[in-house]
């Protein structure tokens, strides 16, 4: 499912064995294997979660809708087509909160991650009420079943209320900027 595989090494590892493992993972498993030092958080999480948290924080500051934020901070920034908020829903809002807490605890107070790893009240409210993403009642997006219809709804970051989701593309976001 995921293309990236991180092999964590330390000073006690035999580098020949590490390199053999890397080659096996690339050739036999088809993974993009990288060798990392043992530090808090996987490399993918250090980069990806940081970028997602910055995007989320900026969306709140800029008073964007989640649809606008996902169009702007999604594909154009290398995030999957779900966009940032959709990706939070896919991963699990509660799991992302746990990852953030882990980083806050394990990383130095001077680490740049600490600046953006603050708890967001709406995120806490979503988790507390069972809106943990796709595995729960919904998250930033939810599917509202009305009779035979399924209506995709998006949460308003300011009010916490849901309304019918407006789909934006990065082209549409560019147009709105003009």
Give the predicted meaning of each segment.
Residues 9-13, 59-62, 110-111:
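Short, polar/flexible loop-turn hinges at active-site or ligand-entry regions and domain interfaces
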Residues 16-17, 65-68, 134-135:
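A short alpha-helix-loop-beta-strand transition element characteristic
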Residues 168-178:
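Single conserved hydrophobic/aromatic residue that forms the stacking wall/gate
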